[in-house]
Amino acid sequence: MKFNVSSTELLKGLMDISKAIPAKSALPILENFLFDLKGNILEVTASDSELTLKTEIEVDTTEEEGRIAVPARHIIDLLKELPDQPVAISTANDSSIECKWTSGNSVLPFFPAEDYPEIKGTGDDAERVEFPADSLIEGINSTIYATADDEIRPAMNGIFFDFSPESTTLVASDSHKLICYTVKEVKTPEKCSFILHKKPAAVLKSILGREDGAVEIAFDSSTVLFTFGKTTMVCRLIVGKYPKYRDVIPQNNSSILKIDRAMFLNTVRRVAVCANKASNHIKLELKPGQMEITAQDLGFAIAAYEKISCDYSGDELTIGFKSTFLTEILANMSCETVVMKFADSRRAALIIPSEDDEESGKICGILMPIMV
């Protein structure tokens, strides 16, 4: 293998996929990048066996093609210290590569590409769909915080992608809160779905940040591929059945609170400072035209109270919530005005953007109350 490439371009490509490199692995070969040079394209692979990232880097000149595995940490650390300049990389012998730059060089070990595990993709029966990158990023951002850490029910540890002929909905829940994010322009001929674990979802979100086109998604019963720009992400899906989330969305909550989202969020945060740190319990007392928010920690003899104006219609209601859950939902909405719909103090509240907001119909949250 022998090629010349910009140090900056090589570093950028490696950093984009380095999130898949494990800190330590039962398979030490996975602590390496797999370099595959064909013509003037260097395909680089990083994997932890569950999550694989591939990218293509255009090199300036190629004198000898080849495939080798290169220590990820060493080559990244070296490139980080180099200013932007051409770098010549070549195999020096059967076990090492040489990196030459303007004023010096470095020798690193490499390992046979044959030792690198084969990365399997999807089968011939894979479903395929295009997803706008900005909508996918927003959908993951809007739901990932609601995923669970549940060893008994692994399906709850990921984001559920629910495709249909009408729309696509991303869903996440930890049994205390549930978030749905709907993208109406993404549709499939028939209903289909998959569950993406929160870890690859977070990686996908971070590397999608610079994309503004469409993401091609292909998936079967066990694997999903995301392709965008020069990058491909391959990961295993969570196998299992996701709960029937639509059945728990309240339909007839008749008591309605309409309030400025930022004001509500800031008030809850202030009052929650005095909430018990174990329960994070706050209490909302709702009456037409006003809402009182209180919290206390009897162990430390502290309490907080604040009254704010609001648009509320319905019976007077006293209801308790875990403040951290309520602030998470409010903070991850971008609407100006939020609507909360209640049935009573024991049943879940529905949290949605106001009907006149552009976010209306796109996102909804469901939050279980706690005993007052």
Q: Where are the language model's segments positioned?
A:
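Structural preference for solvent-exposed beta-strand-turn elements
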Residues: 1-372
